Amino acid sequence: MIVVKIGGRVVKNSLDKVILDIANINDKVILVHGGGDIVTDYTKRLGIEPVFVTSPEGIRSRYTTKEELEVYIMAMSLINKTITSKLCSLGKNAIGITGVDGGLLLAERKKRIIVIDERGKKRIIEGGYTGKVKEVRSEVINHLMKLFDIIVVSPLALDVEESTPLNIDGDQAAFAISKAVKVNVLVILSDVEGVLVEGKVVDRLTPEEAKELSKKIGPGMNRKLLMAAESVENGVNKVIIGSGVKDRPVSSALELNGTVIVNG
């Protein structure tokens, strides 16, 4: 079993390549998708101006109000069913779900977050409807995998305390699922060839090397490296960070094109 995570730009620009490639892979697949650019498009169409905040670490992320959460759910559902429809039309036994369904992903809403304001000052604001995954109900995945070959997962989670869906980071969802079911391989596909240092792809890293390198590279990729290291340390065989915009993107990553994080 493998987990594949595709970022929002891959969803927008290279989705058919990914779907066709996954349809030809002879393994069980959990496909976690993003879609931030598409969410932004729909938000603007509905006359809602999207808001982004920057953390003290320099990571820019969507600030999810109650109103925008509704748009997020609609857009992610559209992406999910588009992917699932295409896979089924290619003869694959696929199902599309969110992390809310079956209580697959249980999360805690961020009550307060620290952001950097326009003056460069730290400020504490209300957390909105964004959450952090606290638990993965792996039995949901295991049961569905007895019935289906491919599970397409939208990055939504259930806040049990407040009985509401939450927007969660797609990478976080993919890493959490991978650790919970201890998959063989986690493939992270974005619009870059892998982890770049001085313009060159780093071919291979141990978890320790990944943690060390995370201190020296930009926000976004540093989080991927930290989560990749933690995943390998917790039972995932290997994590591969590669390009989702090339031909055969998943197969290419499985052929170890990109950055491979693995023990030893």
From Swiss-Prot:
Top-level class of the enzyme under EC nomenclature: transferase
Pathway per the UniProt entry: Amino-acid biosynthesis; L-lysine biosynthesis via AAA pathway; L-lysine from L-alpha-aminoadipate (Thermus route): step 2/5; Amino-acid biosynthesis; L-arginine biosynthesis
One GO term describing the cellular component: cytoplasm
Keyword Zinc: no
GO MF assignments: acetylglutamate kinase activity; ATP binding; N2-acetyl-L-aminoadipate kinase activity
Domain of life of the source: Archaea
Binding site for substrate: G35, G36, R62, N167
Compartments (UniProt record): Cytoplasm
Assigned keywords, A-Z: Amino-acid biosynthesis, Arginine biosynthesis, ATP-binding, Cytoplasm, Kinase, Lysine biosynthesis, Nucleotide-binding, Transferase
Reactions catalysed according to its record: [amino-group carrier protein]-C-terminal-N-(1,4-dicarboxybutan-1-yl)-L-glutamine + ATP = [amino-group carrier protein]-C-terminal-N-(1-carboxy-5-phosphooxy-5-oxopentan-1-yl)-L-glutamine + ADP; [amino-group carrier protein]-C-terminal-gamma-(L-glutamyl)-L-glutamate + ATP = [amino-group carrier protein]-C-terminal-gamma-(5-phospho-L-glutamyl)-L-glutamate + ADP
UniProt xrefs under InterPro entries: AceGlu_kinase-like_sf, AcgluKinase_fam, Asp/Glu/Uridylate_kinase, LysZ
Classification via Pfam families: AA_kinase
GO biological process: arginine biosynthetic process via ornithine; L-arginine biosynthetic process; lysine biosynthetic process via aminoadipic acid
EC numbers on record: 2.7.2.17, 2.7.2.19
Main location: cytoplasm
Site (Transition state stabilizer): K5, K224
Family indicated by similarity: Belongs to the acetylglutamate kinase family. LysZ subfamily.
Reported function: Involved in both the arginine and lysine biosynthetic pathways. Phosphorylates the LysW-bound precursors glutamate (for arginine biosynthesis), respectively alpha-aminoadipate (for lysine biosynthesis).
Name of the protein in its database record: [LysW]-aminoadipate/[LysW]-glutamate kinase
Species for this entry: Saccharolobus islandicus (strain L.S.2.15 / Lassen #1) (Sulfolobus islandicus)
Gene name tied to this protein: lysZ
